[in-house]
From Swiss-Prot:
Known role: Snake venom serine protease that clots human plasma and bovine fibrinogen. Upon intravenous injection in mice, this protease renders blood unclottable (defibri(ogen)ation). Intravenous administration (10 and 5 ug) induces a gyroxin-like effect: loss of the righting reflex, opisthotonus, and intermittent rotations over the long axis of the body. These effects persisted during approximately 10 minutes, after which the animals apparently recovers.
Glycosylation sites per record: N44
Propeptide: 19-24
Pfam families membership: Trypsin (PF00089)
Species, as recorded: Bothrops asper (Terciopelo)
Entry protein name: Thrombin-like enzyme asperase
Oligomer status and interactors: Monomer.
Region (Disordered): 82-102
InterPro entries: Peptidase_S1_PA, Peptidase_S1_PA_chymotrypsin, Peptidase_S1A, Trypsin_dom, TRYPSIN_SER
């Protein structure tokens, strides 16, 4: 079964594919407190929704499948139990930007959403934006995944701190073979460990895939159970959307996404 890795109102939506929003990293370890300065928590009155990534001091990038009403964003978070002094909370300033040509009936089509914050974020010890990519990663690249998603491949076991793991960029043919019933778009990245054991999962949706210090992917969807051999994750390819992102930030709200 393919899982869209999203938790909405604390429920897992069981679909023919699975979004990874609100997922944890499988097979990882606790992230270093200073290695996830761009990681953002999206939450509402029901609890945690998704992750996101700070890309400029007033802009957060996440997955479109994380779109929800009345959510807020928290930055600078490491432990759910111990507050960092520099944590900051923001509301969306306006309606989030989605691709205008996104298929409304396909939750993983053009799975990207850009959110403007109601006020700028100040860089600090635990908060800083992540660079957009200058080019896509090559097959074989080692990339970092991170999030508060479940650390169990089959049940919801959520950690108090984000977990991180290293995975590899794989050829698209691997994901197409793994998910023949779900189109794997060329505007996505296929990433994981062929032998399994490391993966994003429930609760990680919207979070970053970081390769060589650049924000290359957004956690979108994958298999359930998570972390199985030959069942890698599918990530929105950020490099294909950089012009759209820059256009929206510049004020062109009618900018088109790639086909």
């Amino acid at each position: 079964m393919v899982l869209i890795r999203v938790l909405a109102n604390l429920l897992i939506l069981q679909l023919s594919y699975a979004q990874k929003s609100s997922e944890l990293v499988i097979g990882g370890d606790e992230c270093n407190i200073n290695e996830h300065r761009s990681l953002v928590v999206l939450f509402n009155s029901s609890g945690f929704l998704c992750a996101g990534t700070l890309v400029q001091d007033e802009w957060v990038l996440t997955a479109a499948n994380c779109d929800s009403k009345n959510f807020q964003m928290q930055l600078g978070v490491h432990s759910k139990k111990v507050l960092n002094e520099d944590e900051q909370t923001r509301d969306p300033k306006e309606e989030a930007s989605l691709c205008p040509n996104r298929k409304k009936d396909d939750e993983v089509d053009k799975d990207i959403m850009l959110i403007k914050l109601d006020s700028r974020v100040s860089n600090s010890e635990h908060i800083a934006p992540l660079s957009l990519p200058s080019s896509p990663p090559s097959v074989g690249s080692v990339c970092r995944i991170m999030g508060w998603g479940t650390i169990s491949p089959t049940k919801e076991t959520y950690p108090d701190v984000p977990h991180c793991a290293n995975i590899n960029i794989l050829d698209h043919a691997v994901c197409r073979a793994a998910y023949p019933w779900q189109p794997v778009s060329s505007t996505t990245l296929c990433a994981g460990i062929l032998q399994g054991g490391k993966d994003t999962c429930w609760g990680d949706s919207g979070g970053p895939l970081i390769c060589n210090g650049e924000f290359q992917g957004i956690v979108s969807w994958g298999a359930h159970p998570c972390g199985q051999p030959h069942n890698p994750g599918v990530y929105t390819k950020v490099s294909d959307y950089t012009e759209w992102i820059k256009s929206i930030i510049a004020g062109n709200t009618a900018a088109a996404c790639p086909p």
